[in-house]
């Protein structure tokens, strides 16, 4: 026996009524430019205008939810045809730019087969324009995290605050 609940239309219009929260307007996001894992600049507005945009905030040293999120995004990404991929922009933005430089992000991208844009910054000094930009991105998307001092290289403690965002 093979069952596909919810996947077959009953033909009854009453069964097709939308259940959920209708999103009528998106969140306003500041324009920004960050650095890709290929060490090129990425203009958010230019690359996402007119597209559905899927953004994940994560870090490569995470052994908790980040690989799961990446796997799920990869599954979705791989299920889309070229026409759909032209209308959807997938982006990963690091929350650990001190560790996730372009080389590390590119290694992560290749090892996880997450073949979409991964973003970081070059200058992680607190007073740098790069960090000001990245901090503004985190603030715009209400990304919450806590920086904790590591006592060992293997310390992967992190606080994740998953949420979803609608961008216009």
Regions found by a protein language model. Name each.
Residues 12-46, 71:
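N-terminal "domain-start" segment that seeds a small globular fold
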Residues 43-73, 90-91:
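Short active-site neighborhood of thiol/selenol oxidoreductases, capturing the structured segment around
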């Amino acid at each position: 026996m093979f069952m596909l609940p919810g996947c077959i239309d009953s033909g009854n219009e009453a069964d097709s009524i939308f259940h959920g929260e209708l999103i009528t307007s998106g969140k306003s996001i500041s324009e920004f430019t960050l650095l890709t894992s290929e060490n090129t600049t990425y203009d958010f507005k230019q690359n996402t205008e007119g597209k559905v945009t899927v953004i994940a905030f994560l870090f490569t040293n995470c052994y908790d939810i980040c690989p799961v999120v990446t796997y799920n995004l990869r599954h979705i990404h791989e299920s889309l045809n070229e026409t759909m991929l032209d209308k959807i922009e997938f982006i990963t933005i690091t929350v650990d730019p001190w560790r996730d430089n372009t080389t590390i992000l590119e290694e992560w991208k290749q090892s996880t087969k997450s073949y979409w844009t991964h973003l970081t910054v070059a200058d992680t000094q607190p007073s740098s324009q790069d960090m000001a930009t990245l901090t503004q991105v985190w603030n715009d998307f209400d990304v919450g995290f806590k920086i904790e001092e590591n006592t060992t290289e293997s310390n992967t403690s992190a606080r994740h605050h998953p949420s979803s965002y609608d961008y216009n």
